[in-house]
C-alpha cells in the first residue's frame, strides 16, 4: 500500500469518526434513558394506566400525609431524582420524566404548605404518553 493511499484512508477514517461523533452528540438527548432504575416512589406501578395513576396518587398521599414536613418531602423527591421544585401562587411541584423511542412517562408531585412548613395538601399525578 502506497503512502498516498494510507494518507487518504487515514483522512477518510477521521472524517467518518467526526461524522459519527457529531451525529451522536446531536441526537444524544433523544436516545432512550429508561435504562436507569425508577426510584421507589415511581417503581412497581401496575401496567394498567388508570390503576397506575390511582396507585401513584395513593402512594404519594400515604408517604407524605397532610401535616407532614414540607422539607422532608422536598429532600426525598430530590434524592429520588425528581427535578428541583417549582412554585406558582403558593403551589409547589416536582417532576420526574422518562422517555424511550415511542413513549414518555411523567410523575409529578404537587403540594401546598403552611407558614410553619407543614403540608396542607399533596397530590401525585402519573401521565404516560405514547405516540
Where are these regions (language model features)?
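Amphipathic N-proximal alpha-helical interface segments
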Residues: 101-131
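Terminal, regulation- and interaction-focused segments at domain boundaries
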Residues: 43-75, 80
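Hydrophobic membrane-insertion alpha-helices, especially the h-region
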Residues: 6-26
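Short helix C-cap/helix-to-loop transition motifs enriched in small/turn-promoting residues
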Residues: 70, 83, 117-120
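Short, Lys/Arg-rich N-terminal segment immediately upstream of the first membrane anchor
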Residues: 1-5
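A cross-family detector of function-defining hotspots
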Residues: 74-110
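Compositionally biased P/S/T/G-rich terminal and signal peptide-adjacent segments
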Residues: 20-58
